[in-house]
Design a protein with these regions (language model features):
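Core dinuclear metal-dependent hydrolase active-site scaffold
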Residues: 6-60, 122-145
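A structural micro-motif
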Residues: 5-7, 21, 43, 65-66, ...
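Cap/insert and terminal regions of metallo-dependent hydrolase folds
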Residues: 53-138, 142-144
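Active-site HxH/HxHxD metal-binding segment of metal-dependent hydrolases
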Residues: 1
Length: 145
C-alpha cells in the first residue's frame, strides 16, 4: 500500500471549514520557513505545532479560557521552544493558559511541571471549551496574521 493513499491533501491558506467550524491555520517559527504551522479553533483550543516562541501570534488568539497547547522542552533548538524561551517570551497570564507538549522524556515532563507549567502526558484527555460560533470565528480570522 502507498502511504499517501491514506491521506487526502487539500491546500489551505489562512484556514479551512470542517464540520461547520472554522479552523485558523498560521505559520510558526521553524528552522525552515513555511514548513510548520499551527492550528486554532477559536474559543476551543490553540495548537502551536513545532515552533520557537510566537508571542505575537498567541496574543491574537488567547482568550483567557481556551487551552494554549504549545511545543516546549527543557532546551530549545532552531525548531522548538525550550523552557527558558517560554518563560522569557510569554507573560505569566499566557503561560497559565498553556498546556505544554513535545518534551523529550517523562523526566523532562516532570521538570517542566516543577517549573510551574501544565504538562500534557501520554493518555491525558483534555476537555475543550465550546468553540466560538463559526461565523464569528471566520470573521475574526480575516483580521488575524
Amino acid at each position: 500500500a502507498n502511504f499517501w493513499d491514506a491521506f487526502q491533501l487539500i491546500p489551505v491558506s489562512r484556514g479551512f471549514w470542517h464540520a461547520e467550524h472554522w479552523f485558523d491555520v498560521f505559520p510558526v517559527r521553524h528552522h525552515v520557513p513555511g514548513t510548520a504551522y499551527g492550528l486554532c479553533l477559536r474559543g476551543a483550543f490553540f495548537y502551536s505545532g513545532d515552533t520557537r516562541p510566537i508571542p505575537e501570534v498567541v496574543a491574537q488568539y488567547a482568550d483567557g479560557t481556551m487551552p494554549l497547547v504549545h511545543d516546549c522542552d527543557l532546551h530549545g533548538n532552531p525548531s522548538h521552544t525550550g523552557l527558558p524561551d517560554l518563560l522569557r517570551e510569554y507573560p505569566a497570564e499566557i503561560i497559565r493558559q498553556m498546556l505544554v507538549y513535545h518534551y523529550a522524556s517523562a523526566a523532562d515532563g516532570t521538570a517542566l511541571a516543577a517549573a510551574g507549567l501544565r504538562v500534557a502526558k501520554a493518555g491525558d484527555r483534555l476537555r475543550l471549551p465550546k468553540p466560538q460560533p463559526a461565523a464569528q470565528a471566520h470573521a475574526a480570522s480575516a483580521g488575524a496574521i
